[in-house]
A protein has these predicted regions:
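Residue-level marker of regulatory loop/turn positions in helix-turn-helix DNA-binding domains and
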Residues: 1, 71, 75-76, 111-115
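A short, glycine-centered helix-capping/turn motif at helix boundaries
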Residues: 1-14, 85, 89-94, 116, ...
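Conserved tyrosine-mediated DNA breakage-rejoining catalytic core shared by Y-recombinases
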Residues: 10, 14-51
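A structural signal for short, well-ordered beta-strand segments and their strand-loop junctions
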Residues: 11-14, 66-67, 134
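Short, basic/aromatic-rich helical patch in the C-terminal catalytic core of site-specific tyrosine
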Residues: 12, 76-91, 105-106, 122-123
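Short functional hotspots where side chains directly engage DNA or cofactors
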Residues: 27-33, 99-141
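C-terminal catalytic core of Y-nucleophile DNA break-rejoin enzymes
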Residues: 35-55, 63-82
């Protein structure tokens, strides 16, 4: 679920079935009611994960917790996977004629190597306001 949505542990523990829905554009999104800093946001579900997400909530009441208990596993690596996949999807949508890929990490990261609109979308989906956090912690290999 984290790889598909990028949610933090605390956000997962508060997530209700009714917080997962089809966006007006047809994409499945997760409405984070109280994210980092008490902020609300929408996290898009990555393409290909929709059937598993919908199966997880099917037939359950909207007020039910999606995850009554969580395993003790570290989630940051899964959030990084989500961020990188969302970046690639967003960059590919912005420029369908060119194949999006993460720039190689050799030495210092250069912002010019990235699609900044896609980076901003990743930042919003993860609940960050600063794209430098995304560059430093999520888009590196």
């Amino acid at each position: 679920f984290v790889r598909a949505t990028g949610l933090r542990r605390r956000e997962l523990t508060r997530l209700r079935v009714g917080d997962i829905f089809h966006h007006h554009q047809g994409q499945i999104v997760v409405q984070v009611q109280c994210g980092k800093g008490g902020k609300q946001r929408e996290a898009p579900v990555l393409p290909g994960y929709e059937p598993q997400i919908l199966a997880l909530i099917e037939g359950r009441p909207p007020e039910a917790l999606v995850f009554p208990r969580l395993p003790g596993r570290r989630l940051h690596d899964l959030r990084r996977d989500y961020a990188q996949s969302l970046y690639l999807c967003s960059a590919a949508l912005a420029s369908p004629s060119h194949r999006a890929e993460l720039p190689p990490v050799t030495g210092r990261l250069k912002r010019a190597d990235y699609d900044l609109t896609a980076v901003q979308q990743v930042s919003w989906a993860l609940g960050h306001n600063r794209i430098d956090v995304i560059f430093k912690h999520y888009l590196r290999s």
